[in-house]
């Protein structure tokens, strides 16, 4: 007798595996759930499962699988008018590109994600994306651009932690120097 597992059960299985840090099993279960959710009317849930799989694959060190899992999901969210999840999908793609060493593609995806988050006013998540974008810009050798991006990202945080406050203070120094020169 063949036992059929529901998409909901697959999702729960994936969440349990993720909590146990069994990321590869989690990713595979999320992908299986996505396949089950690929019925008409369930595309958004399928895309969400694929993004969860992408995150799990990244945690497992499977960068190419992470990228493949999330590619195209931003379109599903865009067509559904879900800008926040569209931006998150682009951020997931950017993280996969970054892990693969495709820094130009990572920067472009982070930038688009940041713009979408700004449109909807999600400053907290935008701050995280801007900090990731800054790190990529730095790796690309764009030091000044990285500095400006990091400062813009930190300015968005309403209640910065101690580390963020310190970084903000350090970043103000070069800007105040440049202001004195002009």
Q: Which residue stretches match the model-derived regions?
A:
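Intrinsically disordered, low-complexity regions
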Residues: 1-182
């Amino acid at each position: 007798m063949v036992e059929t597992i529901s998409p909901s059960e697959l999702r729960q299985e994936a969440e349990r595996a993720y909590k146990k840090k069994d990321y590869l099993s989690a990713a595979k279960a999320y992908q299986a759930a996505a396949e089950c959710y690929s019925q008409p009317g369930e595309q958004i849930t399928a895309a969400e499962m694929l993004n969860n799989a992408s995150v799990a694959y990244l945690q497992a060190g499977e960068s190419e699988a992470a990228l493949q899992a999330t590619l195209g999901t931003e379109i599903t969210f865009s067509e559904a008018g879900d800008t926040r999840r569209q931006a998150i999908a682009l951020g997931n793609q950017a993280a996969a590109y970054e892990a693969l060493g495709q820094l130009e593609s990572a920067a472009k995806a982070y930038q688009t994600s940041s713009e979408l988050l700004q449109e909807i006013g999600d400053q907290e998540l935008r701050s995280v994306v801007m900090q990731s974008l800054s790190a990529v810009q730095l790796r690309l050798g764009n030091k000044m651009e990285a500095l400006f991006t990091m400062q813009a990202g930190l300015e968005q945080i309403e209640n910065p932690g101690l580390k963020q406050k310190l970084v903000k203070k350090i970043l103000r120094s070069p800007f105040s120097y440049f202001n004195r020169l002009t």
